[in-house]
């Protein structure tokens, strides 16, 4: 069936099917829905995709997604620069910010250590984190990685690394209100608020 599509339609379907969670059938449905849209509406989507790829970058300090560098959180004078919460992905920052409780800053690892997938510590933003801590303003690191095998393993690795390089820094972990194997980005904001306020020393 797909072999009868024009080349431009087939290209669109192929590109849509590359997106996570979108199979060939879903890509076909989306492609034909776009074809039904007015040119103005379809081009508005194209403009939004172009804008996000040209304007969004990683903050040079915390590696969160931002349109300015450093990001708004990093330059906010009301934020406690001595309190750094380590998370896996930018989506986790949004989840923790939704609580309205956390007043520190963040460091986004952009992943977790996954030896089986050949994701090593050097592939994450761990060395920039160590450089940040070496600056002398950080007094507490909160491990906000997900309560998964990989998230816990990454947190343990970081704890040991911090103990070796910066033993003066207190290392804590979000309280275990989150179910094992869950993701911070999907957690209820009340659960996240409790996890922040009830954090425990590692």
PLM features: what roles do these ranges have?
Residues 1-4, 37, 41, 117-121, ...:
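Catalytic cores of large soluble enzymes that bind and process phosphate-bearing ligands
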Residues 10-14, 28-32, 43, 47, ...:
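Solvent-exposed alpha-helical segments within well-ordered globular domains of core cellular machineries
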Residues 27, 75-142:
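Extended interfacial segments that mediate partner engagement and assembly in macromolecular machines
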Residues 102-103, 130-202:
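Long C-terminal interaction/binding lobes of large macromolecular proteins
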């Amino acid at each position: 069936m797909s072999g009868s599509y024009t080349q431009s339609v087939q290209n669109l379907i192929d590109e849509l099917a590359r997106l996570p969670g979108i199979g060939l059938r879903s890509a076909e449905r989306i492609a034909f829905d776009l074809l039904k849209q007015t040119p103005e509406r379809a081009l508005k989507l194209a403009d939004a995709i172009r804008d996000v790829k040209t304007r969004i970058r990683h903050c040079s300090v915390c590696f969160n997604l931002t349109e300015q560098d450093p990001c708004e959180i990093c330059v906010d004078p009301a934020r406690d620069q001595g309190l750094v919460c380590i998370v896996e992905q930018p989506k986790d920052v949004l989840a923790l910010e939704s609580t309205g409780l956390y007043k520190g800053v963040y460091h986004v690892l952009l992943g977790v250590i996954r030896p089986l997938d050949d994701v090593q510590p050097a592939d994450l933003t761990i060395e920039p984190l160590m450089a940040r801590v070496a600056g002398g303003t950080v007094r507490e690191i909160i491990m906000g990685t997900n309560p998964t095998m990989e998230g816990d393993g990454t947190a343990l690795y970081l704890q040991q690394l911090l103990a070796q390089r910066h033993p003066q820094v207190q290392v804590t972990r979000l309280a275990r209100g989150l179910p094992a194997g869950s993701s911070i980005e999907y957690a209820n904001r009340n659960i996240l608020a409790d996890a922040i306020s009830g954090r425990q020393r590692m």
